[in-house]
Swiss-Prot record:
Location, primary (coarse class): cytoplasm
Gene: glmS
NCBIfam families: glmS, PRK00331.1
PANTHER family found in the cross-reference section: GLUCOSAMINE--FRUCTOSE-6-PHOSPHATE AMINOTRANSFERASE, ISOMERIZING, GLUTAMINE--FRUCTOSE-6-PHOSPHATE TRANSAMINASE (ISOMERIZING)
EC number: 2.6.1.16
Residue intervals of the Glutamine amidotransferase type-2 domain: 2-217
Keyword Transferase: yes
Domain of life of the native organism: Bacteria
Keywords, ordered alphabetically: Aminotransferase, Cytoplasm, Glutamine amidotransferase, Repeat, Transferase
Protein name: Glutamine--fructose-6-phosphate aminotransferase [isomerizing]
């Protein structure tokens, strides 16, 4: 999500760090900064916007020093600004950080009570103050870091400097990537390989709960608790472009495989397990306002519209509030009925989708409450809505959305719990059950990703088909729509998603031995109905690709091809079922030789109406 680069050695640190940050630009960012140490004094340069702004700042006021840390920030706590940009300093401690600290508010309140003053809105500054607080008591930099991290909950990749120990660089990892590069008398730290690949190909990959201390010309690895580790380096032969993609052939495949982490980042710090509730402070909707909602309109475009359709099922089922779902480009031209008891919820990955932004403005003008689900912090939609729920998917480079879609589904699930608790339709026990289900999702996604090789074989079998039909019922109908959209977006094969029960009202006329039909048939309340629809396809010679719950032998006996995934409960199944559909579209497109990451005629963010 963010980029980190650290250096300690005989060369000037700033050019190396700046070059590394440039090589991480593909990850997306909204601000950047560098800090070096020279003669025990920290010197920082930070700027909002692109790296060119930071570069110009450094050209006008150079940074000297042979030890330093740098960062590109994708905002999660606090809007993009110079004061929220990293590095952050508290006393003699300077920190750059990727990740999300779950208990930062609790730690911050304690530190403020003890007299500490904060200068930013970030969770990262809390880490700097906490380490400095420990350092004030121990006078030992390394010990202070270990003691501070013992109190931190959440995900982090950290690079830390101390003015009082200017020859030491410390890095730590928990839940966010961190790699160490080994050079000749010099060492590099980065959040991703591309940042340092031009300097060394000898890498040590840190694991969760590990810390590395660079002192006296060599690194010492250990656990945060202090147990020594014998880490082995690996030689990396990747090209720079391969490194940006994490070794994957395309950004889209990389982003498909990032989904477990993206979901974890989206729920981290938001779940109140004991209370059976969730914390969504950035939505700025108090319980009293939520109880005043008479109707919800969800407005979106493309993939986001498909997630909105799933949200309708969730909210009506659990919150008993009527929900309408509109395509943004249609919404503003039909004179919709909107009043002060209407909540307009818009969904946009980029936060800049022109039609969705126009719908938001229309609803605000009519007096509706407004909220947004966005991935990009401080985007136009995020700024103009009354409140926002950010999906922490990180930058999505591939035009065809994958991890942004899945995190939108998770965000809608979170909002459903919050709304249901506020209006009293979800009690504490039910909230705990729903949260328990959410906590399983990252692991279930990991299992679904294990079908990748099987999906590739299926893609090879059906890649020359001219048309595909995707069928689903209930909450899985929008997933059928999304699967069809993915295939047509990147493989240029015509595909349609349809409610399985509507097949006999038209599409059944198209079915023959040349048409693959992808049927979503997990074990749920409509299982028997979908099974019947599948039989109708088979009776007409259709070639059924069935995606079903793990262990469903009945489906395996009927379908031409079966893909089993771990669908844990009816309401979480849409999230898991998305994975094999994404993989199918991806592998068909690769086999057909299309431009997977930048398909023809499409743009990542549609900023024109």
């Amino acid at each position: 999500m963010c980029g980190i680069v650290g250096y300690i050695g005989a060369q000037e640190a700033t050019p190396i760090i700046l070059d590394g940050l440039k090589r991480l630009e593909y990850r997306g960012y909204d601000s950047a900064g560098i800090c070096t140490l020279l003669e025990g004094k920290a010197d920082k340069r930070r700027s909002e916007g692109k790296l060119i702004n930071l570069e110009r700042l450094i050209q006008s006021t150079p940074l000297a020093g042979r030890i330093g840390i740098g960062h590109t920030r994708w905002a999660t706590h606090g809007p993009p600004s110079e004061r929220n940009a990293h590095p952050h300093q508290a006393g003699s401690i300077i920190v750059v950080h990727n990740g999300i600290i779950e208990n930062y508010l609790e730690l911050k309140q304690r530190l403020v009570t003890s007299g500490r003053v904060f200068n930013s809105d970030t969770d990262t500054e809390v880490i700097a103050h906490l380490i400095d607080d420990k350092f004030a008591g121990t006078g030992d930099f390394e010990r202070a870091v270990r003691e501070a991290l013992a109190e931190v909950r959440g995900a982090y990749a950290l690079c830390i400097l101390c003015e009082r120990e200017p020859g030491v660089l410390i890095a730590a990892k928990q839940g966010s990537p961190m790699v160490v590069g080994l050079g000749e008398g010099e060492f590099f730290v980065a959040s991703d390989i591309p940042a340092i690949l031009s300097h060394t190909r000898e890498m040590v990959f840190m694991e969760d709960g590990e810390i590395v201390v660079f002192r006296d010309g060599h690194p010492t690895f250990s656990t945060v608790a202090g147990a020594p580790l014998d880490k082995k380096s690996r030689h990396i032969d990747w090209s720079p472009l391969m490194a940006e993609k994490g070794g994957y052939k395309h950004f889209m495949l990389k982003e498909i495989f990032e989904q477990p982490r993206a979901v974890q980042d989206t729920i981290t710090g938001r779940l109140l397990e004991e209370q059976g509730d969730v914390r969504l402070e950035e939505m700025k909707l108090a319980d009293e306002q939520l109880r005043g909602i008479g109707r919800i309109c969800i407005v979106a475009c493309g993939t986001s519209w498909h997630s909105a359709l799933v949200g309708k099922f969730l909210m009506e089922e659990h919150c008993r509030i009527p929900v309408e779902v509109d395509i943004a480009s249609e919404f503003r031209y039909r004179n919709p009925v909107i009043d002060s008891k209407t909540l307009l919820l818009v969904i946009s990955q980029s936060g800049e989708t022109a039609d969705t932004l126009a719908a938001l403005r229309e609803a605000k003008a009519r007096g509706a409450m407004t909220a947004a689900i966005c991935n990009v912090v401080d985007s136009s939609i995020a700024r103009e809505a009354h409140g926002v729920l950010y999906t922490h998917a990180g930058p999505e480079i591939g035009v065809a959305s994958t991890k942004a879609f899945v995190t939108q589904l998770v965000a809608l699930y979170l909002f459903t719990i919050r709304l249901g608790r506020a209006v009293g339709t979800i009690d504490c026990e039910q909230g705990r059950t729903m949260i328990g289900g959410l906590l399983k999702v990252p692991a279930l996604l990991e299992q679904a990703l294990e079908t990748n090789e099987q999906v590739e074989r299926i893609a090879r079998r059906y890649m020359n088909a001219r048309d595909f039909l995707y069928l689903g019922r209930g909450m899985n109908y929008p997933i059928a729509l999304e699967g069809a959209l993915k295939l047509k977006e990147i493989s240029y094969i015509h595909a349609e998603g349809y409610p399985a029960g509507e097949m006999k009202h038209g599409p059944i006329a198209l079915i023959d031995e040349n048409m693959p039909v992808v049927v979503l048939v997990p074990k749920n309340s409509t299982y028997e109905k979908v099974l019947s629809n599948m039989e109708e396809v088979i009776a007409r010679g259709g070639r059924v690709i069935a995606i079903c719950s793990a262990g469903d032998e009945a489906i395996a006996k009927k379908a031409e091809v079966t893909l089993e995934v771990p669908t844990d409960g009816e309401e979480l199944a849409p999230i898991i079922l998305s994975v094999p559909l994404q993989l199918l579209a991806y592998h068909v497109a690769v086999l057909k030789g299309t431009d997977v990451d930048q398909p023809r005629n499409l743009a990542k963010s549609v900023t024109v109406e």
